[in-house]
């Protein structure tokens, strides 16, 4: 127990795509005292199951091993506390955030099915990472049926349900491995599963229930709708996902003895209701007011913002009452690939001599390419790209789309291509901004968080392309800070999350502002982007046909290697 007068601390743990990060934060002012990161031992499983190299995975699979999440608690939290130099007894609360929609197939006590010997060689027993896109056929059927039936919840998701979400992934398991589906007692969001492990209580957070499980106005899709999709899916809600709902900033429970042993924290401290990594960042930015579009830029980008009123926005990921901040409508959009695209390019498309020069200068490839690209005038490279290398989340909601670059000649360089890809992701964000604005949801400020904030060229491009002032979240670990702020509210240290955020969060306002001549030039490039966007994304099935060809070829290769 914290002695009277001693400083109080909370810990936020951010479970990302490749690693988990723990951050120790002082309750009084949000000072970040110490942190630590633990990389998932198994990373993202995309080719073969761990320990079962003979089990090859089809295209678009992205799985994880839930035991890796527990290792974050065991290693990152004690290390962060040690780095902070504080007494663990002074920690009063713990908050977490998670990628979403990342799903764990579990038994009734929370044990992941992949940890059971009889299911260790079954892909559908493993956690499905947010970027598992192999359920697109199921998502297509959900969308078609919902539209045909006039389901009232569909417009709140922009008219389309994503293959990344709970129902599409669950239906895929039913149809591809019915035995695993039958063995699933709880189909659990990673955000809730980790809180379950910490507290011994399974509480569904209102955010993922709304954004990823189609819960609107207190209800999930009807039994009749699910039965029409597949008779075996009729009881999916009551059998697999229905659970008491916890609001953001509330306590989900307290730390169990086992979790205290893992973390080195006091047994009985408050654990906040789980949250989504993007949405929790609003608290870290102190940007919960309507009109602030927060872009959390990493491997992908998630865009979140609050509004005072309910609006139905085409192609958005959803709108949920209290989904970001209690008492406001929380809107979500996103881009499936951003940092992933830049990483792919530097890994596969940069000549050796460029890499050698970057190394000689003591720069990363990204830094070197960005410096060279910054020397160009807007439009100098003559290129326009589509940022769909991981599909399109908003506004087309189609993960069978793919990337493209138009305008290449024999004079085109890798620097030209790199800048075009940076710009393509900014154009994707502008498409989202304009869709919000046309739907009656005003956007007045772009607030950026995440690792890509360190690239000044990219930030200026985003300001110029969108025409918006761009603010930068002060913390370099914004999701973890946001989780810690929610922990402070859950522990009763502040009246609510906005009050805690005002004391503990913050952003550098107007860090980048639009350059008028660049805005004008980018308007012309953006018009070309919109042409490509609509032709390839709305009016032509070419990209889908190419995906089918690829899948068929991989299927033949898998069959051939098995014979």
UniProtKB/Swiss-Prot annotation:
Source species: Mycolicibacterium smegmatis
| Catalytic reaction annotation | D-ribulose + ATP = D-ribulose 5-phosphate + ADP + H(+); L-ribulose + ATP = L-ribulose 5-phosphate + ADP + H(+)
Which HAMAP family does the UniProt entry name for this protein? Ribulokinase (MF_00520)
The record's top EC class is transferase
Does the keyword field hold Transmembrane helix? no
Q: In which pathway does it act?
A: Carbohydrate degradation; L-arabinose degradation via L-ribulose; D-xylulose 5-phosphate from L-arabinose (bacterial route): step 2/3
Q: So what family is this one in?
A: Belongs to the ribulokinase family.
Please report a single Pfam family linked to this protein. FGGY_C
Starting at the broadest rank, the lineage of the source organism is: Bacteria, Bacillati, Actinomycetota, Actinomycetes, Mycobacteriales
Task: Provide any one GO MF term from the record.
Answer: D-ribulokinase activity
The name under which this protein is listed is Ribulokinase
PANTHER family linked: FGGY CARBOHYDRATE KINASE DOMAIN-CONTAINING PROTEIN, RIBULOKINASE
Q: Name one GO cellular component term.
A: cytoplasm
Alphabetized SUPFAM superfamilies for the sequence: Actin-like ATPase domain
Family matches, as Gene3D superfamilies? 3.30.420.40
Keyword set includes Protease: no
What are the entry keywords?
Arabinose catabolism, ATP-binding, Carbohydrate metabolism, Kinase, Nucleotide-binding, Transferase
């Amino acid at each position: 127990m914290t002695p009277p007068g001693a400083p109080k601390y909370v810990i936020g743990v951010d479970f990302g795509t490749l690693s988990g990060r723990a951050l120790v934060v002082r309750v009084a002012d949000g000072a970040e005292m110490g942190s630590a990161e633990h990389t998932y031992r198994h990373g993202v499983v995309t080719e073969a199951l761990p320990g079962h190299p003979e089990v090859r995975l089809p295209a678009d699979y992205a799985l994880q091993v839930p035991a890796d999440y527990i290792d974050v608690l065991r290693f990152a939290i004690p290390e962060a506390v040690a780095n902070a130099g504080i007494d663990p007894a002074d920690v009063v609360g713990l908050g977490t955030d998670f990628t979403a929609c990342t799903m764990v197939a579990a038994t009734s006590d929370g044990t992941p099915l992949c940890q059971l010997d009889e299911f260790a060689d079954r892909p559908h027993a493993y956690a499905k990472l947010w970027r598992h896109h192999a359920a697109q056929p199921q998502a297509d059927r959900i969308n078609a049926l919902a539209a045909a039936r006039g389901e009232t919840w569909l417009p709140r998701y922009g008219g389309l349900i994503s293959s990344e979400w709970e129902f599409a992934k669950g239906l895929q398991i039913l149809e591809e491995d019915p035995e695993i589906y039958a063995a699933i007692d709880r189909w659990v969001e990673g955000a809730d599963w980790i809180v379950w492990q910490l507290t011994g209580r399974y509480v569904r957070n209102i955010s993922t229930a709304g954004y990823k499980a189609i819960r609107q106005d207190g209800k999930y899709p009807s039994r009749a709708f699910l039965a029409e999709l597949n008779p075996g899916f009729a009881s999916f809600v009551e059998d697999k996902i229905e659970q008491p709902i916890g609001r953001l900033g509330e306590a989900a429970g307290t730390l169990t003895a086992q979790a205290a042993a893992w973390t080195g924290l006091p047994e009985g401290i408050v654990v906040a209701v789980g949250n989504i990594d993007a949405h929790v960042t609003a608290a870290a930015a102190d940007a919960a007011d309507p009109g602030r579009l927060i872009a959390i830029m990493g491997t992908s980008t998630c865009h979140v913002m609050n509004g005072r009123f309910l609006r139905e926005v085409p192609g958005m990921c959803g709108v949920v009452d209290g989904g970001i901040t209690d008492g406001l409508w929380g809107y979500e959009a996103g881009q499936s690939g951003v940092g992933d695209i830049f990483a792919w390019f530097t890994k596969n498309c940069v000549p050796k001599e460029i890499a050698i020069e970057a190394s000689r200068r003591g720069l990363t490839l990204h830094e070197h390419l960005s410096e060279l690209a910054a020397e160009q005038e807007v439009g100098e490279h003559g290129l326009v790209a589509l940022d769909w290398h991981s599909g399109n989340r908003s506004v087309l909601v189609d993960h069978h789309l793919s990337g493209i670059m138009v305008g290449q000649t024999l004079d085109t360089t890798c620097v030209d291509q790199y800048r075009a890809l940076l710009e393509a992701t900014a154009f994707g964000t502008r498409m989202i901004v304009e869709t919000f604005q046309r739907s009656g949801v005003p956007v007045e400020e772009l607030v950026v968080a995440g690792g890509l904030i360190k690239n000044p060229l990219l930030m200026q491009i985003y300001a110029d392309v969108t025409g918006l002032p761009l603010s930068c979240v002060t913390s370099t670990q914004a999701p973890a800070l946001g989780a810690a702020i929610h922990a402070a509210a859950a522990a009763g240290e502040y009246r609510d999350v906005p009050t805690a955020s005002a004391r503990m969060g913050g952003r550098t306002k107007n860090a980048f502002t639009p350059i008028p001549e660049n805005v004008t030039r980018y308007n012309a490039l953006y018009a070309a982007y919109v042409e490509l966007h609509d032709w390839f994304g709305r009016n032509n099935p070419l990209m889908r046909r190419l995906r089918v060809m690829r899948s068929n070829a991989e299927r033949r290769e898998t069959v051939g290697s098995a014979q």
